[in-house]
Every structure is written in structure tokens, then in C-alpha cells.
């Protein structure tokens, strides 16, 4: 069976067993900041297992895209050199949310493996947790696995319940034993069974893990049985494919054979000259194109932090391996079509984003090949003057700032008989590791402990609700029965018109009051998905649990917020229309004063594009079309073509919002007609990260106030320049022309000065082995004068090596020049670095001309005096 057939057979089997086939969630988890990348099939169901989310089904099956290349789960360094490590892999899984348990889960697994996949029963071996007699009995008595092929695994990791066969989500929370199924590759493969001293060998390979969540562990470590036990399973698609295709390495399955062949072809085409088809580097490239492509599909752009940094590391590792094989121009991005051919049918989002993925990877590849060139230049500078060791800080700066791999630094140094201070590099690297944020571990939310009825939200229809009942009160994070005047507290109501912060829209403000008390609401947030907390202060009286009161939203603030939120939807649509369909929302903040919108785009937005975007949005506003919000199933919403955000978590039912030509899923509050927005003006645009742009815009009265402010500044500028506001542009143009003429006259003066100084300084040159050497100061000269003087001296001296210096305050400016006939002997970059290092600086440039700076003028005289001897030594 091919990989595509195995994947489908798994899903079909469980669909026939009453499971809902759930699409893979993105590899970038949009609703879990504790997780760098999706690394297991159960990630998208975490809130279901924790009881925070409910689905319309109790059985699910998935083929989940997973990444393990950052944080706790990091396989990057092993990829390409082992049979089973990957940065990207697919996890097949079936899940029970309080439905079936051990008996059915084990039976399902056995039937699929032995009947559908037709694996020999005597090739399968299972493990159970040592104390899980129930699972042991099911395997032995129901399934019929011989006792000698069932292995009990106890607490083998140094603590109670710390076992290969006991799974815990965290220090507290859901947990339980697991049973694992292993495939025996045969006696000819080294290695022992699980639990033996030789278990790390390759003979027995785990192919499936069934986790039985049956306990809730409290802070004291006590295990409490869960009322509805659940099942979480995972089987690596690549591993089971290797077993079914009778190969020992995952890289020998059909999918990887095809990708490795494509990798060889692209590397050969980029200069590899028939590279070794068995090279581990080709496995690295084939693996990494999967991880990089799916990360880009889900909206990540290469960068220097977080997920963007991980993406950059993976891509550059692949490019580095291509470079080792001889590639000298971009090749990696050319693998995207081959990947789409292998996986595009299973994951249509990959096929849809093919051009975008290719372009992003191509740009990164072009940058890295330039980085290699730049890194070589920096290395050349570090090795100038006969250095025999590249210090660890320099090697780490090349690695961390410029992306220049340490192994490439070591290769270059080795060729020149130079060593790298690897210990110093590790010290710098460890310092960075110590500062890095941990990622990848589940943490159960530590919110307010609320167990009452959910909050009913009425804020779409009204901004006032009478008779709301207090269901809970919190003071300093703890539940209390009452709060009094002066207390900063959180109030939970059974009914509210207050919108709780979510989807980028801030929470409502306002007031809660009855005849005896008054509470000002400064913010509204979600304690749970359907429980709203009203945060603020008791202004008068006392509030008690069970009291009823009137909830009054601040109308002016809500209306301004609604204008901005509705405008954001139209703005999003306009951005895609003007800039392209690659635009994806990466974040937003909507409050009463403005809307801030972050999105994917690789270049600044031009003034012309901003004007077009504004015109589109304001035209929609002037149309004054009615808006509508309809609640429907997620499946029906997808059929309408409503825009959905990558990584966003949606429930079974969603709200489809239509505003003008925009149609998106949104639970926020909005205007009734587009004309209610008034107008929109973009007030700023800029970059916030690599490949991420941000626009801020204002609407309604705020847009008017912004334009009035600009008008005031124009009038003030016109007054200063003694002209009418309507003639301001002409007046500025006149002043620019006057300035240009003055600068031209100054250039003429500087040229004459440089020529005269050149004539004067030329006589100070000293002959050193047939080369005229000059080192002189021109204090007060700027960079332009230094360059012109250098050109004049080179023309006059013909065969020369020259250093000129200028001091302004505590800053030293240096320029070195070498005539073309002398660069074989002396290079300007080496010469300027010789002087710069003595005055606390460094620099670089071309062999004929180089510049540098320093911050220690006191040593300049001695440095210039040493130029003659330095040239003589060459």
C-alpha cells in the first residue's frame, strides 16, 4: 500500500466505526500560546478532553500534520541521520470523548492492523502499564495475544507514574495508562523488546499508542477517576508505511523515495554535478521541504524570533545541505511542486498555496545564499592579519545574527589552517538558550474557578439588560459572597449585554447598578468560553451573590468600537483585493479609538495602494448596505465561502457576518448598516516582523478629528514658510531647489579643498619597496571630503597604499585606498582594519577602497605611524 492509500484506509476504517473524520488542524496552533507547533493529533481536542469545549460528536478520527523542530519536541539535529526522525510527520489518530474505552479501543486497533493492514499477528508485541490489569486482560483474553508477547512496564522514569506507559497532560489534570503496539522486524535486526536493556535497538518499533484518560490528578498527586473516561491514540503514518512497504527506514517509503529523487534533480541542476544519491543530505532536504512548506501554508514567514526563527532554521539547514552537495544557487523552493504532487490531494490547502510557498522559500533561499557571501566577507575580515583562531563570539554572531552555520565557518577555517573557538561558541549559545522561552508543554488554564450556569449574551440586540442575577463574585482571584464600596472585583451575571473581549475586539465598559449599589465595569472578559467576567470597582453600596441589577453598556464607546470592527472586515477584504489573496490576518485590536490590523505581506504598502484601499472601503461605506449575522453549522458556513482565519478555533456552530462585500466568521459586535461607519482613514502603515505588516485606521468622528489635525499642521507650516496653505507644495519645492544649489556650491568648495590637500599630502608619501605609503589626518573632514581627497591622492601617486583619518569629537573616521596595480600585495580592507582595531573599531570594503570607524582618538597617532611597517611586512 502507498502512503496515500494507508492514510485513507485508516480514516475509512474509523468512519465505519462511527467516528467523525475531522480535518487536520493547522501546524500553527491559533488558540494555544503554550505550544510552538502542533505536535500531536490530540492538540486540537485538548479543550474537549479538559471539558472546556463540546463537540457534536463523541468519536473522531484524524490525519494530523505535526511539526517537531522547536521547544521540548525537537528532532531537528537527528533528521537525515536516523531511520525515523522527522521535522514534519503525519499522526493518524482516533479519539473517544467519554464514549468507548479500553475494550473497544484495543479491539479497533487490533482489527485494523491484522485485518485491514494484514500484519502477521506473531509480528506484533504489546506493552501495558504494570498496574493496568484491565488492559492486560483485554489483550490476553479478548484479543488472544500470548502472555509472552504482553509486557508490563512500570514506573521506569524515577517517580510515581513516571512511565513510558503512563501519560500525563501536566503535573495536574487528566492522565492515565497507555498501551503501545510494537512491530518485530525480526531476529536479524539488533535490539531487544521494550523494557529490556537493548530496547533502543531497531528490531522492535512502536507503531501505535493508545492512551486511556481515566484519572484526574490533583495537586497532592491523588488520582481521582474521571466520570467519562476518554481515549487518545496516535500512529505515525511514516512508520506504519515503512512496515507495510517492507522497508526498514521511513526514508525508503514511496513518498520519500519520490521527494529524494526530486531533491537530487534540483541540487544537480544548481551545481551539484551528479551528487551522491545515498547522501543523508538529500534525506534532510526531502524532510525539510515538508516542514517548511506546511509552516508557510499556515501563515508563518521566516524571521528571527518564535516560529519564524524555527522556519528559518529548518530552511537554512536544508539549503546548507544542498550547498554541501555543490548547489551554488537557489534550488530548495523548486521542490514545492514535487511535494504538492505527493500530498496536495490529502491537504488541498497546500495545493492552493503552492505559489505563495514557492515565493516565500525562494526569497529566503536568495537571502541565505547572499548570507553565505556576506559571511565569507566577515570571515575574511576576522582572519585578516594572520589570525589563527576565530573567537567564539564572532562565530556565534555569524551563526545567530547572519544565519551563517557553524559547520560552514569551521569548513572555511579548516581550509585555511585556522581553528574555531568552539568552546566560546558554546558559551554564547548556552547564554542564548538560557534566555529562550520554553515552549511546547501543555498547561491547564489557571483561570477563576467557576462552576455555575453559563452567561447568556444579549449584546447583539440591546445595550441594556434589567434584572441580571449575580451568579459569582471574585475578590483578589478568590470567590466571595459579597463585595463592598471600594473593592476591585469581578462580577459574573446570568445575563449580560456586555461583550467579552475576544476576536481582537476589546471588552465593553459601562455600569451595573440597582437601588442599593453601583459598580463601574472597566473591562469584560471570558472566564470560560460561555462565562463572562465584568471587572471593575464597587462605587456605592454592597453587592451579593444572588442580587439582581441592571447592566448598562457605555453606548458611545460601544458604537465607536462597532464602527471600527465593521470597518476592519471591509478593510481586510480591500487589502486582499489590492495586495493579493496571500494577505492573511495575523492579529487585530479593535477598540473605540482605532482599529489595528496585522497581516501577511512582504513589502511596504505604497501611497497609491493605500489610497486605493481607502477608496474601496469608503465606497462600501457610502453604499450604506445592511449588515447581517447568521448562526449556522461550521460545515454550512464553509459552503457559503465565508473567510476563515488560519489557526482560529471554531466550534460546531459559527456566526457568518456579511458587511458589504465582506463575508467572514465573526462573533463580534457590528453596525447595522455600512453607512454607520461614517468614513475610514488609514493613519499608519509599517512592518512589525519579517513578512508581517500593520495598518492602523480610524473611523467616524475619530477620522474627522485626524483630518482636522492634519489641516492644523498644514496651516502652521504655511505660516512658518510665509505662504498660503494652497501654495505650500510650491514653496517647499522652491526651498529644496535653493538647498540643492547651495549643496552644489559646497561640493565645488570641497573638491577644491580635496585637490589642494591632495597636492600638499602627496609630498608626505614614503616609498616602501616601490609602493608609496601615506597615512595622514584631515580633522573635520566628512566622509565625502575623505573620499574625494583619497581619489585625488591615488590619481597623483599612481602606485600607492593610503590611509586618511578624521576626528570629530570622540569619533574616528577612516578610509583606506590601494591603487589597482597594488591590490595583489595590499588590500584596502586589511589595511583599514589594521588601523581600526587600534582605535576601538572595525570596518571593511573592497580591495581598492574600504572604510571604518573607531571611538578612541587617543591611539590614532600611533596607529597611523604603524602603517608604514605594516605595509613593509606584506
From Swiss-Prot:
It is found in: Cytoplasm. The keyword Protein biosynthesis applies. Binds 1 zinc ion per subunit. One of its GO terms (biological process) is alanyl-tRNA aminoacylation. One of its GO terms (molecular function) is alanine-tRNA ligase activity. Its EC number is 6.1.1.7. Keywords: Aminoacyl-tRNA synthetase, ATP-binding, Cytoplasm, Ligase, Metal-binding, Nucleotide-binding, Protein biosynthesis, RNA-binding, tRNA-binding, Zinc. It catalyses: tRNA(Ala) + L-alanine + ATP = L-alanyl-tRNA(Ala) + AMP + diphosphate. It comes from the Bacteria. CDD domains: AlaRS_core. Zn(2+) binds at residues 565, 569, 666, 670. SMART domains: tRNA_SAD. It holds the Pfam family tRNA-synt_2c. SUPFAM superfamilies: Class II aaRS and biotin synthetases (SSF55681), Putative anticodon-binding domain of alanyl-tRNA synthetase (AlaRS) (SSF101353), ThrRS/AlaRS common domain (SSF55186), Translation proteins (SSF50447). GO terms for cellular component: cytosol. The keyword Hydrolase does not apply. Catalyzes the attachment of alanine to tRNA(Ala) in a two-step reaction: alanine is first activated by ATP to form Ala-AMP and then transferred to the acceptor end of tRNA(Ala). Also edits incorrectly charged Ser-tRNA(Ala) and Gly-tRNA(Ala) via its editing domain. HAMAP family: Ala_tRNA_synth_B. Consists of three domains; the N-terminal catalytic domain, the editing domain and the C-terminal C-Ala domain. The editing domain removes incorrectly charged amino acids, while the C-Ala domain, along with tRNA(Ala), serves as a bridge to cooperatively bring together the editing and aminoacylation centers thus stimulating deacylation of misacylated tRNAs. Belongs to the class-II aminoacyl-tRNA synthetase family. This is Alanine--tRNA ligase. The gene is alaS.
Amino acid at each position: 500500500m502507498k502512503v496515500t492509500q494507508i492514510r485513507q484506509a485508516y480514516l475509512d476504517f474509523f468512519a465505519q466505526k462511527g467516528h467523525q473524520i475531522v480535518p487536520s488542524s493547522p501546524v500553527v496552533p491559533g488558540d494555544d500560546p503554550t505550544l510552538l507547533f502542533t505536535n500531536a493529533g490530540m492538540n486540537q481536542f485538548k479543550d474537549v478532553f479538559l471539558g472546556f469545549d463540546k463537540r457534536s460528536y463523541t468519536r473522531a478520527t484524524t490525519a494530523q500534520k505535526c511539526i517537531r523542530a522547536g521547544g521540548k519536541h525537537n528532532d531537528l539535529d537527528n533528521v537525515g541521520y536516523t531511520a525515523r526522525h522527522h521535522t514534519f510527520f503525519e499522526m493518524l489518530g482516533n479519539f473517544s470523548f467519554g464514549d468507548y474505552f479500553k475494550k473497544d479501543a484495543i479491539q479497533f486497533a487490533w482489527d485494523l492492523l491484522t485485518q485491514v493492514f494484514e500484519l502477521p499477528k506473531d509480528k506484533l508485541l504489546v506493552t501495558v502499564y504494570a498496574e493496568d490489569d484491565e488492559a492486560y486482560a483485554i489483550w490476553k483474553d479478548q484479543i488472544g495475544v500470548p502472555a509472552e508477547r504482553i509486557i508490563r512496564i512500570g514506573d521506569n522514569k524515577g517517580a510515581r507514574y513516571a512511565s513510558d506507559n503512563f501519560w500525563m497532560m501536566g503535573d495536574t489534570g487528566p492522565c492515565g495508562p497507555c498501551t503501545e503496539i510494537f512491530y518485530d522486524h525480526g531476529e536479524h535486526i539488533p535490539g531487544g523488546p521494550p523494557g529490556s536493556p537493548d530496547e533502543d535497538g531497531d528490531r522492535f518499533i512502536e507503531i501505535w499508542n493508545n492512551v486511556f484518560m481515566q484519572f484526574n490528578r490533583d495537586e497532592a498527586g491523588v488520582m481521582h477517576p474521571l466520570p467519562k473516561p476518554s481515549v487518545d491514540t496516535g500512529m505515525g503514518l511514516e512508520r506504519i508505511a515503512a512496515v507495510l512497504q517492507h522497508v526498514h527506514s521511513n526514508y525508503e517509503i514511496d513518498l520519500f523515495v519520490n521527494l529524494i529523487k526530486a531533491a537530487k534533480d534540483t541540487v544537480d541542476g544548481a551545481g551539484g554535478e551528479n551528487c551522491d544519491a545515498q547522501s543523508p543530505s538529500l534525506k534532510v532536504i526531502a524532510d525539510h521541504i515538508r516542514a517548511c512548506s506546511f509552516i508557510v501554508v499556515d501563515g508563518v514567514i521566516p524571521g528571527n524570533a518564535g516560529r519564524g526563527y524555527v522556519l528559518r532554521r529548518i530552511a537554512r539547514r536544508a539549503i546548507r545541505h544542498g550547498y554541501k552537495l555543490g548547489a551554488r544557487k537557489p534550488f530548495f523552493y523548486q521542490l514545492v511542486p514535487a511535494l504538492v504532487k505527493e500530498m496536495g490531494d490529502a491537504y488541498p490547502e497546500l495545493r492552493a498555496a503552492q505559489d505563495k510557498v514557492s515565493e516565500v522559500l525562494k526569497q529566503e533561499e536568495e537571502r541565505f545564499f547572499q548570507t553565505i557571501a556576506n559571511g565569507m566577507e566577515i570571515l575574511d575580515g576576522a582572519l585578516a592579519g594572520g589570525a589563527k583562531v576565530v573567537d567564539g563570539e564572532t562565530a556565534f554572531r555569524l551563526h545567530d545574527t547572519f544565519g551563517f552555520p557553524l559547520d560552514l565557518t569551521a569548513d572555511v577555517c579548516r581550509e585555511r589552517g585556522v581553528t574555531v573557538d568552539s568552546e566560546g561558541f558554546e558559551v554564547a549559545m548556552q547564554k542564548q538558550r538560557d534566555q529562550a522561552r520554553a515552549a511546547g508543554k501543555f498547561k491547564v488554564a489557571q483561570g477563576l474557578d467557576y462552576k455555575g450556569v453559563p452567561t447568556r449574551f444579549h449584546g447583539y440586540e440591546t445595550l441594556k439588560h434589567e434584572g441580571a442575577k449575580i451568579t459569582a463574585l471574585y475578590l483578589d482571584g478568590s470567590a466571595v459572597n459579597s463585595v463592598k464600596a471600594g473593592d476591585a472585583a469581578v462580577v459574573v451575571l446570568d445575563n449580560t449585554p456586555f461583550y467579552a473581549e475576544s476576536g481582537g475586539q476589546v471588552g465593553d465598559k459601562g455600569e451595573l447598578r440597582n437601588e442599593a449599589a453601583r459598580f463601574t465595569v472597566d473591562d469584560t472578559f471570558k472566564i470560560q468560553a460561555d462565562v463572562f467576567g465584568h471587572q471593575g470597582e464597587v462605587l456605592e453600596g454592597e453587592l451579593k451573590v444572588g442580587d439582581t441589577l441592571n447592566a448598562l453598556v457605555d453606548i458611545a464607546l460601544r458604537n465607536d468600537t462597532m464602527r471600527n470592527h465593521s470597518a476592519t472586515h471591509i478593510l481586510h477584504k480591500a487589502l486582499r483585493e489590492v495586495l493579493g489573496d496571500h494577505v492573511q490576518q495575523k492579529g487585530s485590536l479593535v477598540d473605540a479609538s482605532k482599529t489595528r490590523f496585522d497581516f501577511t505581506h512582504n513589502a511596504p504598502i505604497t501611497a497609491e495602494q493605500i489610497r486605493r484601499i481607502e477608496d474601496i472601503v469608503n465606497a462600501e461605506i457610502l453604499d450604506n448596505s445592511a449588515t447581517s449575522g447568521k448562526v449556522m453549522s461550521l460545515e454550512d458556513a464553509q459552503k457559503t465561502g465565508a473567510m476563515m482565519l488560519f489557526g482560529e478555533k471554531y466550534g460546531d456552530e459559527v456566526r457568518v457576518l456579511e458587511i458589504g462585500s465582506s463575508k467572514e466568521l465573526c462573533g463580534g459586535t457590528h453596525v447595522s448598516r455600512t453607512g454607520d461607519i461614517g468614513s475610514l482613514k488609514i493613519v499608519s502603515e509599517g512592518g512589525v516582523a519579517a513578512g508581517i505588516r500593520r495598518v492602523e485606521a480610524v473611523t467616524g468622528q475619530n477620522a474627522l478629528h485626524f483630518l482636522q489635525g492634519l489641516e492644523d499642521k498644514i496651516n502652521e507650516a504655511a505660516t512658518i514658510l510665509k505662504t498660503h496653505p494652497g501654495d505650500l507644495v510650491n514653496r517647499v519645492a522652491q526651498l529644496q531647489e535653493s538647498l540643492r544649489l547651495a549643496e552644489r556650491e559646497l561640493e565645488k568648495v570641497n573638491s577644491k579643498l580635496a585637490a589642494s590637500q591632495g597636492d600638499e599630502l602627496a609630498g608626505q608619501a614614503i616609498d616602501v619597496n616601490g609602493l608609496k605609503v601615506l597615512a595622514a589626518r584631515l580633522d573635520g573632514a566628512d566622509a565625502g571630503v575623505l573620499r574625494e581627497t583619497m581619489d585625488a591622492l591615488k590619481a597623483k601617486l599612481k602606485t600607492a597604499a593610503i590611509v586618511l583619518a578624521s576626528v570629530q569629537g570622540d569619533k574616528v573616521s577612516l578610509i583606506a585606498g590601494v591603487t589597482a596595480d597594488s591590490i595583489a600585495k595590499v588590500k584596502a580592507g586589511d589595511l583599514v582594519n589594521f588601523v581600526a582595531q587600534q582605535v576601538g573599531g572595525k570596518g571593511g570594503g573592497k580591495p581598492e577602497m574600504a572604510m571604518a570607524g573607531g571611538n578612541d582618538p587617543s591611539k590614532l597617532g600611533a596607529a597611523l605611524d604603524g602603517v608604514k611597517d605594516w605595509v613593509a611586512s606584506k
